[in-house]
Amino acid sequence: MKWSAFKKPVSLLMSAALSLTIVSGVFTVHSSQALAASSTEETRFLQMYQQLKNPANGYFSPEGIPYHSIETLMSEAPDYGHMTTSEAYSYWLWLEVLYGHYTGDWSKLEAAWDNMEKYIIPVNEGDGKEEQPTMSYYNPNSPATYAAEYSQPDQYPSQLSGQYAAGRDPLDAELKATYGNNQTYLMHWLLDVDNWYGFGNLLNPSHTATYVNTFQRGEQESVWEAIPHPSQDNKTFGKAGEGFMTLFTKESNAPAEQWRYTNATDADARAIQAMYWAKELGYNNSVYLNKAKKMGDYLRYGMYDKYFQKIGSASNGTPTAGTGKDASHYLMAWYTAWGGGLGQTGNWAWRIGSSHAHQGYQNVVAAYALSNPSGGLVPNSPTAGQDWTTSLKRQLEFYTWLQSAEGAIAGGATNSWDGSYKAYPAGKSTFYGLAYDDAPVYHDPPSNNWFGMQAWPVERIAELYYILASNGDTSSENFQMAKQVVQKWIDWSMDYVFANQRPVTDSEGYYLDSLGNRVLGGNNPAIATVSAPGEFWVPSNLEWSGQPATWNGFSSHNGNPNLRVVTKNPGQDAGVLGSYIKALTFFAAGTKAETGSYTALGSQAEQLAKALLDAAWGYNDGIGITTVEPREDYYRYFTKEIYFPNGWTGLFGQGNTLPGSSAVPSDPAKGGNGVYASYTDVRPAIKNDPQWQYLENKYNTSWDPQTKKWTNGAPEFTYHRFWSQVDMATAYAEYDRLINSDQGGPVEPVAPKAPSKPNAVAGDAVVNLSWNSVSGATSYTVKRATTSGGPYTMLGTTAQAAYTDSNVVNGTTYYYVVSASNSVGESPDSPEASAKPASTPIPVQGNLKLEYRTNDTNPGDNQFRPQFRIVNTGDTAVSLSNVKIRYYYTIDGDKPQQFHCDYAAIGSSNVSGTFVKLPSAKPGADYYLEISFGAGAGSLAPGANSGEIQVRVNKTDWSNYNESDDYSYDATKTNFASWEKATLHLNGDLVWGLEP
């Protein structure tokens, strides 16, 4: 790239005034932190955090869900601004991670995860509502029935033909063994947050937010051609007796009532990426880190071919069913999906992967976190760590294979040509048996033309480069690939990105050089610019030609001289800008971590990042950083292009009949026989939007249907997209964390913030303390008192976020606080924690043993769900009707309770439970649950076990428990293990365990 100096933006004065306005009282959320911030970038991060969390700004719904956008009239991936996506949730986690880093308050991160689990991960999160009610009927030996994909929506519905038998799912058994069931712990990708479509949440009607879907009909189905439909379809809406299912698939009989969810793999991977950084920045709550591990365990379904066909076997048009992991491409595919039946005959379920892998969906940081012990999030299933180890290398190879001669990353690859396992075209380049595809998944517009699909994934590669360099791994092949890809990409992209200058283009968006010639690729182009103080410009689109060479390994890679890109259409997308700045920042920091100082390119990247951050701040309107967007595509609100098959008519959630009375005949050249409706025919409620009249007037006065041009300018909108704002906010934070903090920055160092409340665990003559580490702290001082509130006496100092106090007397309650220190000074004390050490009694051990586990890692919900297994270690049979289990807990508000046995190998009807209140409360217990067994449970032979017993308890008013201090609860026990804090009684005598 060619380097030119950056000018200081003239908007600094304006942005300083904006900063003063924000800090001086418009917002009330932790304004003291903004005032105390130690750098410009930290200040701006905290101000943007306040803007995002201020209820008056409208980023969140009444249920606390982040909207895709504050504004509602929009159509892109979501077709309405008050939808939300799994993408938005993953960005929310990232925001809260960096807020926790600055403030030491990690409760916001945990609240975000709880909200995600409640509203967009379709599991029973503790409210008793089963959102995957029939997943237990899934048969991993026959995951799903084949239906071909087609290029045009007009060619749908697709016949459920079973032409190709699905392969075997190799993950289901180990996931069941690890977690006790196969309820998929992944986000569904799309929510109708305000129930704007009107379908309602069938399986959890107390929620306003509703699981919905749109895209179902092939690569040419844009948002303008999609039909919104409920993910839980009992045929109330859609065609009578058929629901919406017959728009997408057809079979010999009417479709059954069903639920179905689709996961966007990039979003869940980003959530895991965020939790990795939380852990690196001092967060240590194993409950939520274990949830991230579990998500990563299930995310492996994104590595599998849609119908579990052997990878590469369809290159000749005849796929072979996979027998296990031979159906895994080890990349992040576009999606994975699962579903099942509803109602009394709904005893079936299915699961699919995806055959198409897009470079923009890969996440090497998540793969690192889930595979490397240093990453700290290796899932619990036996083969998960190895799968993610393979995936990490495979993803890095994928990027190397797809990098163009200039440096941009091409589209991706597929295991199913045209979505129907057709033979690969002659001469098609391959990658581990997958065929090169320049635009995987969708073609309207081509999926790899948007520059955001460059900035998103390469920012993650820049992170990995920094992580590996910081850990001293500068020689491995993984490091070499990460460095090569990000370095070449940064060098290419910086030629087309500008701060305080505006690039010169022609009428079609091509960059021009100083002679007025189009820049059509090549290395180190000299783009003509004009001075534009305070502006920023990044590319919007790319044009692709050629293909990579067939992959034969990193050592033989030739750099792809025949894969070329043309960079076009400079724009001002704030979200893309945020990701791009983070890519520059992590790359710059990585060069310093690798070599000890910034390389020449690293220094240029750091300076460009700073200039872009300063320029972007001038676009902050008090609600967020945003620019005016001309929407050339919004004529499509009025065109009729949503296909309905001939004779299909049904009810939409907004009360209208589909396809409506004004539909027009479809184009037979596209393969269908039906009609086309418009956006407003399908979603008439959009006409009530406050911006609709403006759009309609603009269309009537400016759109020329003959030339298909806006003769009086395209409609213009200003959007505050949640993900875009978070991308910008976190760009300020990461620059501050990696650049300012690393080199001292432009500000004076400050004393650290107070640690979070310590976790105090009492033992026999010992108390073990731990707390979240604090940014900038070099040591911690532990203080103790025997009276709550002090006065406290210093016990000692430690460089670690943990301390063991062995100078204690059993039976005495001790109160602890911790402060953090560095060369500048000492923080205030943490909140107080207490512990009472006690001698360890010896548990009873007879001829029965109790094993325990839980998959309930949320200790604050409204149910608890222990799972047990009784083992006969003696030499005589034991009748289970003579055995009782006692599980000790605190009720946290005395209310009537209900017992449920969800599953038992000995028969759920043979298991019953009663609740016994202790005469006097014990540590961690004021009640116990006593589980007993009927005669039908039979007896346990010597050496045998009872099989799994899954129980569930709730209060009748569904108020919450707090299990975190319950005597018998242990969130870390996710696999069956001996557990002495739940007891066994035989004929009334204690034969196993330790009572509180």
Where would I find each of the regions flagged by the language model?
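Asparagine-centered strand-capping/turn motif at beta-strand->loop junctions
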Residues: 870-875
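Recognizes extended acidic, P/S/T-rich segments that occur
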Residues: 781-811, 829
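Short, solvent-exposed loop/turn segments enriched in Ser/Thr/Gly
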Residues: 858-867
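Beta-strand-rich modules
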Residues: 805-824
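Terminal connector regions
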Residues: 948-996
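A surface/secretory-pathway sequence property marking extracellular, secreted
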Residues: 891-929
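Extended ligand-binding clefts on enzyme/binding-domain cores
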Residues: 47, 118-252, 262-266, 289-705, ...
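Pro/Thr/Ser/Gly-rich low-complexity, intrinsically disordered linker/stalk tracts
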Residues: 748-776, 810, 823-841
